[in-house]
């Protein structure tokens, strides 16, 4: 008997256990069947028992001899009596899920798990996993012709199958090589991978009778945490970085024995969903890594089912193989904590928001989780960060969403900080998490929960009975970007769709959900390390956040429909006034920066400061300022950042020099003002420094800002960015203001995410059924190990990029970049020379300040008269020259006669 049940009597028709618990795997039905309405045979009419016990007391069959019945049907099972293919029947009324799937308790076993194994217990291949009326499934074996170059000779088996609830669903055995590395039962979630070919829209997934493995156990598993990792074409390093953090969090929760929710079997309450955006876009090395974990298998996916196109390929497997990164190579680590994996490989590339629709509307509706965690591939959560996010919801029942601290990845020893762009972004991220996020969390409304690392309460996101609500507004962005009727405002707004989701969640009708910032939860992500990458990233961020902020301000009255208290609504009102002021400053950022520059550089020309040197420097920098700002506009309106990288880099250097000059001007002017006070004939008092208007305006205001940054960082016990990144941030501030803002606003017409592309991909086989049954070819059992070894070898070595010859489209793009570059140079030369001519003639643009003559008005009048004379007499001379030519033509014509 099962030792966990003591001396309790065995239920009817259950064979005595030889000292090991029966492990029949998961039972394929959605209902727990707790009401005992199925008579003496238990729920066998709707619920199947699986043979997994030897009546003679032998140990379970070793995993490497399990038979593969991948195409076995479990459809149309009603009406069956007692199972005829097994030696016992299990009554779910007396046993719960923990009985059928034992808690993870690794114990040492020899290679191959053949302790006590007897050869005569081998199960023939045609014996089904589940009892079925026609258990001997006919099959036809054939072999592909030998591949050239010594490739693996692939064997396939044509198997008969029946649809499961009208859908194509296979249970496929995982490779024996993988089984030998991990503990497992006779036939359970560790030995078989489940494949489903979804032929519907994600909104219809549940209505089309698709389900997931967690709902198929005799006692369906409750999903407390549902984690999604969205990816596009990230390589295996980025993917492994994220999955390593997720696995560590699951291990952390399983090692909390005193928790009411978590503990040894915590992994059963957590499902990790990986959604890849397009079969043609997934990185082959990442796909091979998933195969190495047992989550993916090549050769079983189908293109069409009964002439219906497959929209997503869904693979389910409980893996005990974790990952680690050593020397920039991903390695598999076996015999670790089990993790329930769900891999959704979308057939077409449809953007990240569509991936979230599969997560929330398709899989979420089936699993009905409590908390949903959103991650981007490449973001590595801290070892206990996901737990701390969950804890925020557990402690605050009205917490509808939460986010942690996003950190910039700095590399070993912070070596990435040597790149000024990385250091500046590190400072940005830190100050946002020290000042912005805590402020918004105190009010209860965070303007944006970053999609790279955030969490939501699933019930809080649900729409009302009329289909209106947070998710409805959130997924509206998918149709807006795909349709021609979308306005430019809405399209840009939904570039920051996570901001819309936050707003709609807090303003949800008749609810009072709040958003929180969890500082103890951290997520590390890589940041752009080149100017071109930064420009492209911030284009979407700036445009999306700006238009989403306008949306929130315009729809501020939507807070009145919520059920928040008057005090909370008043707090929201104060926060929105604050956000409006910030948006106004962001709108006038370029103008404000130029005015500060002009005032400081002009002041340096005073005789008490730099005098004539200051005037000349001011004019030179003003001209350069105008030239580079015009260059920003010209590049933004027509050039690709990738094709103008050198120009953007040059602009970064120029704006850094401008910032150095401004900082020098502020300090120099203040010091001179203090010296003047010290040398005052009326005496000097320390209080006179603070009464000095120049010192008060420049130094006190600046030091107040920087002092607040430093004090807040010290209070948060996170001050190191002030030492390592402050200088780089200050030098790149003009670049953020001028270059990034100009490019963003000049490209408001571009509402793409930069990931939509060609979906041409290798065609998969199709299947057709008649009366719910059909035939298909699947990888043969003998080829599983060879296929597994081939997949593992893909990522076993460091990736070496092979430079291939550029494609015709790439060559054409390079040619267009060259043409755009020439056009940019011509336009800039044309604009600058014309502007220079006007400035010289009119003595404007600072030229009047460097004149040495005392009567500047007379000089300007004289210069204007000379200019007018030159222009007018030049026009007259040109006309006269034309007249002479015309007269000569008439003379020649008169003598020629024609």
UniProtKB/Swiss-Prot annotation:
GO biological process assignments: cell wall organization; chitin biosynthetic process
Carbohydrate-modified residues: 685
UniProt-annotated stretches for the region Disordered: 1-154
Record InterPro entries: Chitin_synth, Chitin_synth_fun, Chitin_synth_N
Membrane topology annotation: Multi-pass membrane protein
EC primary class: transferase
Functional description taken from the UniProt entry: Polymerizes chitin, a structural polymer of the cell wall and septum, by transferring the sugar moiety of UDP-GlcNAc to the non-reducing end of the growing chitin polymer. Shows additive effects in septum formation with CHS2, CHS3A, CHS4, CHS5, CHS6 and CHS7. Regulates mycelial growth and conidiation. Involved in virulence and mediates mycotoxin deoxinivalenol (DON) biosynthesis via the regulation of the expression of TRI4, TRI5 and TRI6.
UniProt name for this protein: Chitin synthase 1
Native source organism of the sequence: Gibberella zeae (strain ATCC MYA-4620 / CBS 123657 / FGSC 9075 / NRRL 31084 / PH-1)
Phylogenetic placement of the source organism: Eukaryota, Fungi, Dikarya, Ascomycota, Pezizomycotina
Gene: CHS1
